[in-house]
């Protein structure tokens, strides 16, 4: 009797559908763009920082289990103004020579309306910049490619937006010319790996 019970349990376990695991994603041909916005002497200036590495995992069955671990190459940060770019990478701001990478690691996904990563969704995480780690929150959107089938999650578009104070990370240089508040807008084209 014990043997039959054991076999029945074994077959029941085999019959259960496998639990879905998070799917790894990589950057697609469109890559990722991190755009930052800051105020320099009263005018808005935009710059970009390229993504160095991205380890992304999305779990369609449990979106709150999705994760992101992304680095940006601070040495390649750019603005439209050469003097602003050099000041940005200087020791008193990003100190690119000593801290060549920034890193974001997600800690929590909070879903928006309808249980989706859009419509009010946020991603919390830790941002390390200049060797200083602080918690940050981004408004998050995750979409299928336009024209794709409803169940086609092979190619997705991601957008994250947030704001923060550069002084929280010790980037205090040129405070007489550059406001403390910085906006961040990240757009990424990702593909299932």
Q: Where on the chain are the PLM-derived regions?
A:
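N-terminal export signals
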Residues: 5-21
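Low-complexity, acidic/polar, glycine-enriched regions of mature
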Residues: 20-193
């Amino acid at each position: 009797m014990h043997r039959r019970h054991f076999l029945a349990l074994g077959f029941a376990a085999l019959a259960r559908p496998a639990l879905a695991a998070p799917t790894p994603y990589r950057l697609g041909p469109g890559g990722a763009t991190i755009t930052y916005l800051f105020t320099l002497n009263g005018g808005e200036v935009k710059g970009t920082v390229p993504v160095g590495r991205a380890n992304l995992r999305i779990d369609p069955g449990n979106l709150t289990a999705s994760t992101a671990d992304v680095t940006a190459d601070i040495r390649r940060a750019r603005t439209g103004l050469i003097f602003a770019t050099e000041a940005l990478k200087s020791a008193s701001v990003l100190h690119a020579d000593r801290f060549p990478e920034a890193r974001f690691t997600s800690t929590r996904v909070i879903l928006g309306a309808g249980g989706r990563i859009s419509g009010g969704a946020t991603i919390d995480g830790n941002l390390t910049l200049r060797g200083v780690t602080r918690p940050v929150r981004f408004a998050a959107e995750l979409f299928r490619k336009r024209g794709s089938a409803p169940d086609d999650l092979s190619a997705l578009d991601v957008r994250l937006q947030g704001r923060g104070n550069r002084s929280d990370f010790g980037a205090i240089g040129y405070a007489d010319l550059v406001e403390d508040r910085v906006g961040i807008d990240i757009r990424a084209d990702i593909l299932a790996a």
